[in-house]
């Protein structure tokens, strides 16, 4: 009873924090000049991370098994993983802007998990016999950590593509207020440099303008390089987790069902995900394919991950059909 009450309190606290963080992000989306809100956002992310950690630990204690038995628990663990990974670039010098790209993923994942849509599966239940294994922690945690890292890395690649398209087709994006608004959301510093250059274009001192124009291109190129750098490294980490998760899952499947691989929808899409990011890592070794070319592959992988993790589960077929259904024993 005490554990259930504590979990209930932490769930509401984390949901309240997430609601506030969404509001802060919307404000910074519309008014990029309010810099102090970014610090509030990061502090809120830390507090939400500890709330989720406490929630998962409490749920683990009173349920008697690692909290990864249904969609609600896996979403909370995914949100925890995204929050953890989002802190990595934040501690690096001058890399705080990367955390503002990754952060919203953790926010909206947790918001969906704690919303009323999944209320009926918030209660923890007894696992079916096949899942009462030590492999549950190894397999599922590695898979979700892999999904989280791959999602973060892919999101950075999507951001890289947006910047590259803005660079190549500036006239289209600057004339479209919707894209200009999106630019101020993730890339406020670059948008600020664009405005400075537009002002300088009206000055007679062309050499002064040329200096600032080259400065703008320099910062844009540096930003693209940082996105490419972090995207590659985070995806490499996620690929390692995904590989360990697939291999451990194959061993567990052989113990539980007598077969290493059954080609059910979940396994098939996990294999497709692995292939896509293996291609990304392979072409990334070629200097000519770095940057936008490899980012296209990672962006495709971003969609495939969500199909593999979320979409396939909701089909309700195969050995992994635990999407919106609780794994209870008869």
UniProtKB/Swiss-Prot annotation:
One of its GO terms (biological process) is cytochrome complex assembly. Required during biogenesis of c-type cytochromes (cytochrome c6 and cytochrome f) at the step of heme attachment. Belongs to the CcmF/CycK/Ccl1/NrfE/CcsA family. Keywords: Chloroplast, Cytochrome c-type biogenesis, Membrane, Plastid, Thylakoid, Transmembrane, Transmembrane helix. GO terms for cellular component: chloroplast thylakoid membrane; plasma membrane. The keyword Coiled coil does not apply. The chain crosses the membrane at residues 9-29, 44-64, 65-85, 97-117, 143-163, 234-254, 263-283, 295-315. GO terms for molecular function: heme binding. May interact with Ccs1. InterPro entries: Cyt_c_assembly, Cyt_c_biogenesis_CcsA, Cyt_c_biogenesis_CcsA/CcmC. It comes from the Eukaryota. It is a multi-pass membrane protein. It is found in: Plastid, Chloroplast thylakoid membrane. This is Cytochrome c biogenesis protein CcsA.
């Amino acid at each position: 009873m005490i554990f259930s009450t504590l979990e209930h309190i932490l769930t509401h606290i984390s949901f309240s924090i997430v609601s506030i963080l969404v509001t802060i992000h919307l404000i910074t989306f519309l008014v990029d000049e309010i810099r102090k809100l970014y610090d509030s956002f990061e502090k809120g992310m830390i507090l939400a991370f500890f709330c989720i950690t406490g929630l998962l630990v409490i749920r683990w204690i009173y349920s008697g098994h690692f909290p990864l038995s249904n969609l609600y628990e896996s979403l909370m663990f995914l949100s925890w993983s995204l929050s953890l990974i989002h802190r990595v670039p934040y501690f690096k010098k001058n890399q705080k802007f990367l955390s503002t790209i990754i952060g919203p993923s953790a926010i909206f994942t947790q918001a969906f998990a704690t919303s009323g849509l999944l209320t009926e599966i918030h209660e923890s239940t007894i696992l079916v016999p096949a899942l009462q294994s030590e492999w549950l922690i190894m397999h599922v945690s590695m898979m979700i950590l892999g999904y989280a890292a791959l999602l973060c890395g892919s999101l950075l690649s999507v951001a890289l593509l947006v910047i590259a398209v803005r660079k190549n087709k500036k006239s289209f994006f600057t004339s479209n207020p919707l894209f200009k608004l999106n630019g101020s959301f993730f890339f406020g510093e670059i948008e600020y440099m664009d405005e400075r250059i537009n002002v300088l274009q009206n000055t007679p001192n062309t050499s002064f303008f040329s200096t600032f124009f080259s400065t703008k291109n320099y910062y844009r190129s540096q930003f693209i390089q940082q996105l490419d750098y972090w995207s590659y490294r985070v995806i490499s980490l996620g690929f390692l987790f995904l590989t360990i998760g697939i291999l451990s899952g194959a061993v567990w499947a052989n113990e539980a069902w007598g077969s290493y691989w059954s080609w059910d929808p979940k396994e098939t899409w996990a294999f497709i995900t692995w292939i896509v990011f293996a291609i990304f890592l392979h072409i990334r070794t070629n200097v000519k394919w770095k940057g936008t070319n490899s980012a296209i592959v990672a962006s495709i992988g971003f969609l495939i991950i969500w199909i593999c993790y979320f979409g396939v589960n909701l089909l309700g077929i195969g050995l992994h059909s635990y999407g919106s259904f609780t794994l209870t024993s008869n």
